[in-house]
Structures are given as structure tokens and as C-alpha cells.
Regions:
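Accessory RNA-recognition modules of RNA-modification enzymes
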Residues: 1-185
Length: 185
């Protein structure tokens, strides 16, 4: 049986759930379509204990300021059966601008592999923090709530009292959202 959900704390046991409180309402529709596709094409979910199965994860990225959505399936192989049918199904969701596959054939519990293949659309979505737009790929680290991130960065900018002559080091920065935000000053 195919389930979606979250890892229980400090385990690799999955707590079944399709409604992420941090996510957007479209997440459930995406997951329903992916599961229907897996069932139609007899695609097995990945089993971390055996290393068998194809679909490891479904990564959904959503641009809160642009309403752009990316769906990326992380797979334990090179090709997903029925890729064209999956693209057709996911593109019925109006916000979809990108459908991708990420290949992770390593027997580990790391989510993403290094190889990304675009099935349809753009290789990224765009979102904003403050007045700065960012192009976000499946491999990008980006905050899950850009509204609150913008407010938090605004406070940091206020407290930093920058004159514009400082050098900011954004260590472990993901895609550099903090330093780019502070560079406004």
C-alpha cells in the first residue's frame, strides 16, 4: 500500500498524512495524482530497509508570491514509467510550471540525489522574500514561509544598523537569502 506522510521523531517510521500544516492546499491534490499514477503504472514506493522500490519522495515547491508550483519525484532509478501521463495529470493543476525527476540510487536515507531531469516546464520556480526574487530549483534550500522570513530578515536588517560599508558573510547560506536581503542597505 502506498502512503504519504512524515517521519516520526528520531525514527524512519512514517506517520501517514496528506495534509501538511506548513504546505499549501494543492499538496493533497498533487499527492493524490502521484499515487493514482503509481497505482496505474504499478510503481512501487521505495523501501529504505530493502533498497527496493522506485519512488522515494515527492518534493513540492510552491511560490507563495507567484503561485508557481514545482513537483519533483525523487526516484531510485533513471526513468519513471508513464512519465508523459504523469506530466499530463499534474499539468491539469493550474499552478504547475515544472515537473521533474531527481535520481537518488544510493542506499541511504538522504532525500535528494545529484541528478535532476526536467520532464516539463521550467527548471525552477520563482518566489520572493521582501523585494528580492529567487529562482528555486529542487536542490535549492529556501525557507518554507517566505512571508515570515521577510519579516524576520527585516528585523535583522533593522537591528544590524548597517551603513552600507560592511561585509556580510552568509555562511551555510543555501541560496543566499540573508545576504541578498541585507545588501539592500
Amino acid at each position: 500500500r502506498i502512503i504519504t506522510g512524515f517521519y516520526a521523531g528520531r525514527t524512519h517510521s512514517i506517520i501517514e498524512n496528506r495534509d501538511c500544516a506548513l504546505g499549501v492546499t494543492r499538496n493533497k491534490e498533487v499527492l493524490d495524482r502521484v499515487i493514482a499514477h503509481m497505482e496505474k503504472f504499478h510503481i512501487q514506493p521505495y523501501d529504505e530497509n530493502t533498497g527496493k522500490g522506485l519512488v522515494r519522495h515527492v518534493l513540492i515547491r510552491y511560490g507563495f508570491f507567484t503561485d508557481e508550483m514545482m513537483v519533483c519525484l525523487i526516484i531510485n532509478g533513471e526513468k519513471l514509467p508513464g512519465e508523459e501521463a504523469l506530466v499530463k495529470s499534474l499539468c491539469q493543476i493550474p499552478e504547475t510550471v515544472s515537473v521533474m525527476v531527481n535520481v537518488n540510487k544510493k542506499r541511504n536515507n538522504v532525500i535528494l540525489g545529484e541528478k535532476v531531469r526536467l520532464l516539463w516546464g521550467q527548471p525552477y520556480i520563482t518566489d520572493k522574500i521582501g523585494e528580492i526574487s529567487y529562482q528555486i530549483s529542487p536542490l535549492s534550500f529556501f525557507q518554507v514561509n517566505p512571508y515570515q522570513t521577510g519579516r524576520l530578515y527585516g528585523k535583522a536588517l533593522e537591528y544590524a544598523q548597517l551603513s552600507g560599508n560592511e561585509t556580510v558573510w552568509d555562511l551555510y547560506c543555501g541560496i543566499g537569502t540573508i545576504s541578498l536581503f541585507l545588501a539592500q542597505k
